[in-house]
């Protein structure tokens, strides 16, 4: 956690993001629509969607949510791992169940309804199981887990059960695979000797449960330990080559790399 008022910190981070865009000489764009993303693809520049993980500092009336939406935020995860006024995040140690506490509060249900009204993406990645099912009940758009893996392969509380995976599939949503060692490995360790085939194993499993239209890359390049073979975002071509060597053709690779995300964002944003 970062000391200070969480709303002030969010505004500072958003200001930094906009400074990066201003200094990018047009190579980075903040996207507010699926059409914006498609233009970035055509122009061969980086497309960015502003996302907030953890709404703990938000007021319960929707003013903060409205303000960040007006500033360009189009995706939100109500929780990190800890509880806030909206409900409980997922916590607990490995191995463990995602059923770690109560679900959404009344304010949390209101938040989901406010997000629905704004047609923002809702991220379930850091929700415990009860909050997940509460969100599934109240959400009006496809469910999205931006950076989560299969609990059956790595029983971290943060990973998703088969039942949750099916619910995301049935909503028309997507799961973005997390590259963090601790969320990939069957032993739950953070060791970076994790082979890229472990990521492929999770993708295989998710596709078997959900189908190839509901799985994507999620990454989580943010303070986690990663496989040495991957390193950082520059290592993605090595992962793509590993997927090709594992039998994935270009049609499915395109879905994993961008098509599934774009389809879901179009549906969420209703464009």
From Swiss-Prot:
Coiled coil start-end: none
Name the GO terms of the biological process aspect: proteolysis
Q: Which InterPro entries match?
A: Metal_Hydrolase, Pept_M19
GO molecular function: any one? metallodipeptidase activity
Q: Spell out the PROSITE patterns in the cross-references.
A: RENAL_DIPEPTIDASE_1, RENAL_DIPEPTIDASE_2
SUPFAM superfamilies for the chain? Metallo-dependent hydrolases
What Pfam families does the annotation carry?
Answer: Peptidase_M19
Family that this chain belongs to: Belongs to the metallo-dependent hydrolases superfamily. Peptidase M19 family.
Write the protein's name: Uncharacterized protein in pqqA 5'region
């Amino acid at each position: 956690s970062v000391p200070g008022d969480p709303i002030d910190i969010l505004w500072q981070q958003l200001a930094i993001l906009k400074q990066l865009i201003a200094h990018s000489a047009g190579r980075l764009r903040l996207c507010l629509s699926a059409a914006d993303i498609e233009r970035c693809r055509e122009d061969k520049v980086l497309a960015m969607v502003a996302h907030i993980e953890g709404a703990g500092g938000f007021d319960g009336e929707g003013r903060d949510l409205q303000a960040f939406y007006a500033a360009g935020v189009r995706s939100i995860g109500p929780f990190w791992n800890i509880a806030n006024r909206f409900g409980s995040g997922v916590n607990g140690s490995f191995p463990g169940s995602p059923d770690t506490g109560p679900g959404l509060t009344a304010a949390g249900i209101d938040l989901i309804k406010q997000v629905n009204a704004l047609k923002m993406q809702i991220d379930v990645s850091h929700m415990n199981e009860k909050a997940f099912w509460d969100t599934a009940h109240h959400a009006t758009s496809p469910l999205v887990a931006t950076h989560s893996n299969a609990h059956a392969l790595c029983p971290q509380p943060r990973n998703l059960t088969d039942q949750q995976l099916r619910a995301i599939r049935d909503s028309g949503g997507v799961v973005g695979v997390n590259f963090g060692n601790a969320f990939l490995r069957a032993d739950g360790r953070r060791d970076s000797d994790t082979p890229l085939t472990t990521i492929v194993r999770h993708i295989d499993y998710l596709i078997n449960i959900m189908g190839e239209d509901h799985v994507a890359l999620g990454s989580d390049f943010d303070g986690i330990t990663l496989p040495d073979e991957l390193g950082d975002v520059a290592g993605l071509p090595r992962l793509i080559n590993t997927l090709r060597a594992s039998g994935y053709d270009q049609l499915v690779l395109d879905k994993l790399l961008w098509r599934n995300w774009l389809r879901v964002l179009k549906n969420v944003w209703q464009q």
